Amino acid sequence: MTRCDDSPSASQISITHVTQGSCVASSSPNEVYATILGSCICTCMCDPVAGVGGMNHFLLPSADVEDAQHLRYGSHAMELLINALLKLGAARQRIEAKIFGGAMMTPQLGAIGQANAAFARRYLKDEGIRCTAHSLGGNRARRIRFWPKTGRVQQMFLGSEDVVPNEQPQFRLQGGAGDVTFFDRHNNAEMPDPIKEPR
């Protein structure tokens, strides 16, 4: 059978799992980034003209959004991602972002998920980066897949029986175009798009 398009086959797709503290970027049409989020935030950024995109995954050390020392961790994660895109040929004024996560998963972490979400939205606003979509908060973990070449994102909410990585605040710094599709693992049906356009 002859393929009539340039879409990569399943055997060509490379899935990179992005863990807490990581930042990745690519221009490959064969690359897919995947992560699981509880209280953490992941930012998916893309320059749709250059066809480059990337993802970070971070958790602030505390829920205190006024603590400049703690906010450094989130700012560092964002700056790493932006710089990685610029090195691949992105133009800063064209970069678009989608943000996910910030759930309230355990009493031990308190309102840290909410603080992470607030930080991400404020950072994008302050830096003049357009947030085209977000899915934040709640009390369920999310599985995210991101196609950096096109900016497409797929989200699935996980159930209580699913294994979610143990998220812990970190105290050391570590070095969009497209559509968003939502699935519910309990019925495997595409859900109405609950992403809200930020105000």
UniProtKB/Swiss-Prot annotation:
<comment type="function">
    <text>Probably deamidates glutamine residues to glutamate on methyl-accepting chemotaxis receptors (MCPs), playing an important role in chemotaxis.</text>
</comment>
<dbReference type="GO" id="GO:0050568">
    <property type="term" value="F:protein-glutamine glutaminase activity"/>
</dbReference>
<dbReference type="InterPro" id="IPR005659">
    <property type="entry name" value="Chemorcpt_Glu_NH3ase_CheD"/>
</dbReference>
<dbReference type="GO" id="GO:0006935">
    <property type="term" value="P:chemotaxis"/>
</dbReference>
<dbReference type="InterPro" id="IPR038592">
    <property type="entry name" value="CheD-like_sf"/>
</dbReference>
<dbReference type="InterPro" id="IPR011324">
    <property type="entry name" value="Cytotoxic_necrot_fac-like_cat"/>
</dbReference>
<dbReference type="Pfam" id="PF03975">
    <property type="entry name" value="CheD"/>
</dbReference>
<comment type="similarity">
    <text>Belongs to the CheD family.</text>
</comment>
<protein>
    <recommendedName>
        <fullName>Probable chemoreceptor glutamine deamidase CheD</fullName>
        <ecNumber>3.5.1.44</ecNumber>
    </recommendedName>
</protein>
<keyword id="KW-0378">Hydrolase</keyword>
<keyword id="KW-0145">Chemotaxis</keyword>
